[in-house]
Amino acid sequence: VSGPRTQAEPVTLTVDGSEVIVPKGTLIIRAAENLGIEIPRFCDHPFLDPIGACRQCYVEIEGQRKLFTSCTTEVAPGMVVRTQNTSDEAHRAQVANLEFLLLNHPLDCPICDRGGECPLQDQAMSFGPGESRYAEPKRTYEKPIALSPLVKLDRERCVLCARCTRFCDEISGDRFIELFARGAGERVSIAAGEDFRSPFSGNTVQICPVGALTAEPYRFVARPFDLTTADSVCQHCSAGCNIRVDLRRGSVVRVLARDNADVNDAWTCDKGRFAFRHADLPGRVTTPLIRDRGLEPASFGEVFADIAEWSREGRAAFLSGGRLPDEDAYALAKLARVAFGTNDLDHRRTFHGGRAEQLAAASPLDTTYRDLERAKVILVAGLDAEQEVPILNLRIRKAARRGAAVFVIHPRRTRLWDVAEHTLCLPEHQTYVLERIHDGEAPGDAFEGRVSGALREAAGEAVVLVGERLTEHPLAADVALRVAQRYGAHMALVPRRSGDRGALRAGVHPSLLPGGRRVSDQAERAEIEGSWGSLPAEPGRSTRQILEACANREIDVLFLIGIDPLRDIPDADLARRALSNTRHVVVQSLELGSLEPFADAFLPAAAWIEREGHATDWEGRSQPIHAVRGPTGVSRADWEIFEGLAEAMGRPLGFGDLGALRAEAAPLLEPRPVTSRSTAWTGTGRPQRLGELTLLAYPLLVDEGRLSEGADELKAALGQDPFVELHPEDADKRGLVDGGRATVTTEAGEAVLDVRVTEHIAQGAAFVPFNQPGLAANELLSGSFTTAVRIEPAVAEPAVAEGAA
């Protein structure tokens, strides 16, 4: 997607006597950094536009009569710069400016959360005045001011660097926090009556240089020197955000974003930042269990032996929750086929990826974040990036700021509404829209025509992003692939969960082996058999087909690895019947939860902060996960459990350690060519919608998911009560009003919900959040996240007269 780019002209300058060559347009402060020279600053941030607000980075430029702010001044050929290290004038200016900033700054370092890692504290100690000449009382404010349940403001600490407001304006686009008033009264605040309700609010806390903004979950919890830290990769979604995990006395107390310009820049979402307590909750089970008049503690060996006995006598199937690290996913794919002789394994909830899915399994890093930044056109289909892969949303916004044209096909208007053109259409119509874009025959004033024209003009510098909601419909992903192929664009399937791409690549799939090799293709299967031995040749069953087989008593042993069908599968009735009718259910997870009545064995898995491995993000980029602490109890990494199961079955996997596992997997997971011909959609005309309305149900960013357990402040800030969302015309036809109550009825079930009326949803569609507190949306579904629905005003319950019996 990159295409030809003009190389920036090199510029040679001198900083503190050392010569440096940098591209034209580089700021002086960055040129100094290239030489290892640190110029003090507060407002400057490498991922924000320069502003020169704090005036702390003054430098002297030879031949100029005044000092310059190095964070706003670009280099010039032959420029000679003197920083505070070699210029007395620059040093005096910085000391004076620091003294000015300290006039009203409180001396509360001993209780400030920024103490020990504060740039203002460091600079004051390094070259600031030892005593203040200011004799008047310092300015004070009410403290703390709760901007949201997550973010607190100690206003008297603020130095008005505008980092927080610039982040909201330039990066996230949700301008809840702003600078108000002017002069001595200028202050950071939010509008009266509003919360700082942003899924990226924690970034403002991390980039605040003085502790004016603090995070409620970390407030007064620890000092930097109390912490042990480790670098890792966030496991909440497929964004692949680089993070730092901080522990105090063995428990996670803070998560920070790490800089990586190729992935997350310097940001992470609030879910990744604040949902970190799940591994330490009381409900976690850290010892193996076996059912014997109830679930009783046992050794791993005892549980493995019982499972092996059950499995030798019957048929087994495996369902994974899509969050396994890459190594563990590979071990699971081998375990199912080698030790249990089955292709009945899947990590997907509902998915029709077609050839696009095979390409994603075989060709990692085909489309990247960098491609998005360079793209002239971005087409987003069936993906609500902010709710599903939040950092991807920020990168799309970044591309839009640089001039990219962004188009979105979705039933709901996403948070990209201010930088993208949307077409709101029912799920079953999205394939039709894509086919019209592919044909390129729509009139130029139609959405499809504008997208076709933009893709044509982009001449290959375009990206097509396909979300899970699109892939629920057969052939939709293949049609999107045909669009990308016709216009020379890159395409990526964007899964929601952190382990989905790695599981697909590793072969946790009923019809694909590692590297996207087809089970049904003898030659491709033979490539894996050379390492694994003889494999079953018939493709297995998908997640839904496995559950149906369990419900029909065709499966004897069902392995649930990090998945709870009662919560995760869009068909609660099928999940209950499957669990009830399966002879033996084996649960491998951190907790039992709602599966306790059905589990015959429990295998305690180590949390992601307790083990080593790799995680593959939506791009196909594999990044290392590092253990922050040792396993809790006797829990084990998933791959170690799989090895123990295989040995009990008499078919050891032969790994021994992670190094051996990786050595075996590496050649089988190398990128390989795949014939990319996709299947054409054969629909005629615009498809007819099903039923009165089409109900959509998919998870929002903050839900009742297991990784969000314990994140009470996050849920208070961003969580939502259950609701049903409709278009105004659909609401009017049914006598529904915003804020009222409605009865939502499908073939599967019924619920009474609050009504939200908005033009941000397609006419003919209704939306309910999946897995929200107080609503089990899968009770309304029958195997897909969309279904026909009837919605009508709720009948008020008759009032009971006062004093009545």
Feature locations, PLM:
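A glycine-rich, hydrophobic/aromatic-adjacent loop/helix-cap motif
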Residues: 462-551, 619
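Short acidic (Asp/Glu) and glycine-rich catalytic loops that position anionic groups and cofactors
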Residues: 74-79, 183-187, 283-288, 375, ...
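A cross-kingdom feature strongest in bacterial/archaeal respiratory oxidoreductases
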Residues: 2, 39, 44, 333, ...
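N-terminal export/assembly segments and adjacent metallocofactor-ligating motifs
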Residues: 2-27, 33, 45, 60-64, ...
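Glycine-rich phosphate/diphosphate-binding loops that line cofactor/substrate pockets in enzymes
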Residues: 303-316, 368-376, 450-463, 487, ...
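Long hydrophobic segments that form regular secondary structure
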Residues: 249-257, 261-266, 271-280, 287-288, ...
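Short, charged, surface-exposed secondary-structure boundary motifs
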Residues: 354-358, 417-419, 432-438, 502-503, ...
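A generic structural motif
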Residues: 342-354, 403-413, 488-502, 582-595
